[in-house]
């Protein structure tokens, strides 16, 4: 392999790696957006669940089932 061929091969590899890095970076950014969105939804659902639990908890007696 001549030095020019070697240099060309290395340049091709670098270009492919840069493309892969850019693609992975885009995917990672989208995943972080999804994680952030889902975290916010989970927080809202947790708050809603706790509110509903507080509303119904006083009405539900804590007793052992009859088979105990």
From Swiss-Prot:
Superkingdom of origin organism: Bacteria
Pfam families referenced in this protein's UniProt entry, alphabetically: SlyX
Family note: Belongs to the SlyX family.
Alphabetical list of NCBIfam families matching this protein: PRK00736.1
HAMAP family: SlyX
Name of the protein described by the UniProt record: Protein SlyX homolog
Organism: Brucella anthropi (strain ATCC 49188 / DSM 6882 / CCUG 24695 / JCM 21032 / LMG 3331 / NBRC 15819 / NCTC 12168 / Alc 37) (Ochrobactrum anthropi)
Gene that encodes the chain: slyX
